[in-house]
Regions:
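Short, compositionally biased
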Residues: 3-102, 121, 198, 203-232
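An exposed tryptophan-centered "aromatic clamp" motif
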Residues: 83-86, 90-103, 109-196
Length: 232
């Protein structure tokens, strides 16, 4: 399991998943690296609750359909803004990513799958073997002033669950791709555990509430946040 270290991104350094690094004054956690360890992807320690899109009246297609690279989706939205006389205020989540500095963007569908695979220990099975990875990463993030990877509400009866994450990739019908565990059964400190839960992707509306489920927890219990990423 990776032990986090804090360092500024350097061209001569080697990194591994779980390292805490600083890029342009913004701290992030390394979530992907190439074979050399010199290049990869960091994810912001800070999360955002901002909506993908500002108003229901804007439930249009922006051509942000790229699944491999969220920066391409950022550029698609930038083109949409220029061509339609709009502004970044119409896309609060992307405006937040831009506020972090040059090069920060909301990850694509495939990038989210890669991030969760790496943070989960190399696969998409959330079980007793992989839960310690998330807990270790979460401690590193919080120790460096970041936001919790877990959340809880009345539907979880006080037990923590792993928050889903929102992608920059549009789906059909005014929706966007997100990633979360199957049926939201991801209670990390429940006495019974959550064995063999599959991490999966599905779609929510651009203006959908970030949690679903009823107070007694009889329905699906999900919550979604967003984090930005930056290549190095």
């Amino acid at each position: 399991m990776a032990i986090a270290v804090v360092a500024a991104i350097s061209a001569n350094a080697q990194y591994k998943v779980g390292d805490i690094c600083t890029l342009g004054g913004v701290k992030g956690i390394v979530v992907d690296v190439d074979a050399t360890g010199a290049h990869g992807l960091i994810m912001s320690l800070e999360e955002s609750k901002a909506d993908w899109i500002a108003h229901k009246s804007l439930a249009m297609e922006t051509n942000a359909f790229y699944e491999d690279d969220g920066m391409k989706n950022m550029q698609a939205i930038e083109r949409y803004i220029a061509e339609n006389g709009s502004s970044w205020y119409s896309f609060p989540l992307f405006a937040w990513a831009r506020s972090l500095g040059d090069g920060w963007y909301i990850p694509s569908r495939e990038e989210l799958i890669t991030i969760w695979t790496n943070l989960n220990g190399g696969n998409l099975d959330l079980n007793k073997k992989s839960r310690p990875y998330w807990k270790t990463h979460n401690k590193s993030i919080k120790r460096n002033g970041g936001d919790d990877l877990f959340c809880k509400n009345t539907s979880t009866m006080g037990f923590k669950m792993l928050c889903g994450m929102i992608s920059s990739t549009e789906a059909e019908g005014g929706k966007v791709y997100v990633i979360n565990t199957e049926k939201g059964q991801n209670l990390m400190n429940h006495p019974m555990g959550a064995p063999n839960v599959k991490i999966m992707e599905y779609t929510i509306g651009k203006r959908a509430h970030r949690s679903e489920g009823d107070p007694l927890g009889f329905k699906r219990v999900l919550r979604f946040r967003a984090r930005a990423v930056h290549k190095f």
